[in-house]
Amino acid sequence: GVQVAGPGNCAKRLDVAAAAITMGATVDDMAQFNLGYAPPYSVAIDVLVNAAQVMQNKLSGVAQALTPLEVQALTEQGEDIMLLDVRTPAEFAEVRLKHPKAFALPLGRVRDKAPDLPKDKLYIPFCKLSLRGYEAAKILEGQGFKRVKFMDGGVIHWPFELEYGKG
């Protein structure tokens, strides 16, 4: 099934999802959907197609993520983790995780700072949602880090304590 709510063109998403369900589409099928769009009004890759592509990456192991609850469980188990907040300094100053293992390292500085980071820790980059966290994870993997997973949902979906104001 599918549920659709919110601003934007919900009817289109519902129609596409209903058609996919009716035809028995797999995640791989949906990732290949080529839907019509108008550049001034929508993106080239529909959000449903993008979601299917993200799922493909997760199922194949290309994208390895942890939920905020899994991150918290690792913390409670004493796992040696480093939470990398890869958002901009302005975003960090506005709101940040209140977590002893979280620190700011903006995405644009990850490549330069990676050689200074110990490689024996589990690195968990995150951002507002997930995209920059995923990108930072790929940068670290490209620099030889073996223990890297990004945090799904980022700050927006962190259900634990946050700090606000100047960081």
Model feature map: region roles:
Residues 1-30:
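C-terminal catalytic lobe of FAD-dependent flavoproteins
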Residues 28-80, 89-124, 128-167:
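Rhodanese-like catalytic fold shared by cysteine-dependent sulfurtransferases
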Residues 83-85:
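Structural scaffold elements adjacent to functional motifs in cytosolic proteins
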